[in-house]
């Protein structure tokens, strides 16, 4: 779990997301509170519940990007889901409890990676020993095999040195590996994912875990495979499961996107199985309930829920009152200005302009963006957003593709050229489309 301070978390988010300081502060505090809670004594820890967040803002301003970056920073079980994929219990579609099951699977994977990293050095030594045993077969005396384990053996040490220096990488060896388990892929009927998981587990256990298969491969590849195999033997699956369930219950973060799409609209009639019904099913999950998973029972009392939505048609007050009460922290994200769009093109790490420079550099083209060129692209994006649908920063992707369309097509024939995208270059490619509103509506 991350022990970064709120300022450090916000600073890290600033490297990738322009503006939206209120939203960054809210998620930074929420993430730090996860760490603070774990420092409390057991009795107090049970009483402190997370304050869930509702992020409100137009499309393309950074709601989903904050979630993506938070997942990398959290170093905790994190899952992002779309609210529109779920239906209420009893109807065709995924039920909301599958969110918790997916979170537990993420926690198991994360914990296994952490545990395998702890035994990596030991696994490397064991893998080297297995390779050396193949290269220098054990000596045979009488009826028994005696393994030559003496580390001061000159031959063995010589081969170990060559192995570590990579001089034996291309030599082929034959190694014993666990036989691949029979993959029985069962298409899960909606709402029955848990049962199909159990069936898959049953078929895999019938295939037998102790079977081995000989494979020929180069030493470089064999070492990687053997390190994984040895690390898997060194870790305890029961410990992994126990730690993962604790981590999911106490550090788990669930990000629910597009929550505005499950609001009941006043003019709609008939059963709303994918709207209000889903909200009612989410209530016990957010409030705290126990969900049955194939790894055991999981409590959701201390999981952090972050919901987000554009709320262009619906309003936050259209959510059922009980759900509003369970999302106490409201954060409003602002629409992007012309200056924000210009910053998005240049300031974030791996910004759009840097991505296109790197892509065209592979063809031997040196691409540069002048300041007036960047300003012109930002102004054009803002203008199209204002006159048609406002899709925020996503508009920049459309414009950049349009501006660099010809250059990308002819790049392989223009090797060695140096090209600057300035105001005139942008005007030549975009102005005709911008002036014709009907064309810009469909093309930009």
From Swiss-Prot:
GO terms for molecular function: ATP binding; ATP hydrolysis activity; peptidase activity; proteasome-activating activity. It comes from the Bacteria. The keyword Cytoplasm applies. GO terms for biological process: protein unfolding; proteolysis involved in protein catabolic process. It is found in: Cytoplasm. One of its GO terms (cellular component) is HslUV protease complex. Keywords: ATP-binding, Chaperone, Cytoplasm, Nucleotide-binding, Stress response. InterPro entries: AAA+_ATPase (IPR003593), ATP-dep_Clp_protease_ClpX (IPR050052), ATPase_AAA_core (IPR003959), Clp_ATPase_C (IPR019489), HslU (IPR004491), P-loop_NTPase (IPR027417). ATP binds at residues 18, 60-65, 257, 322, 394. Belongs to the ClpX chaperone family. HslU subfamily. ATPase subunit of a proteasome-like degradation complex; this subunit has chaperone activity. The binding of ATP and its subsequent hydrolysis by HslU are essential for unfolding of protein substrates subsequently hydrolyzed by HslV. HslU recognizes the N-terminal part of its protein substrates and unfolds these before they are guided to HslV for hydrolysis. A double ring-shaped homohexamer of HslV is capped on each side by a ring-shaped HslU homohexamer. The assembly of the HslU/HslV complex is dependent on binding of ATP. This is ATP-dependent protease ATPase subunit HslU. The gene is hslU.
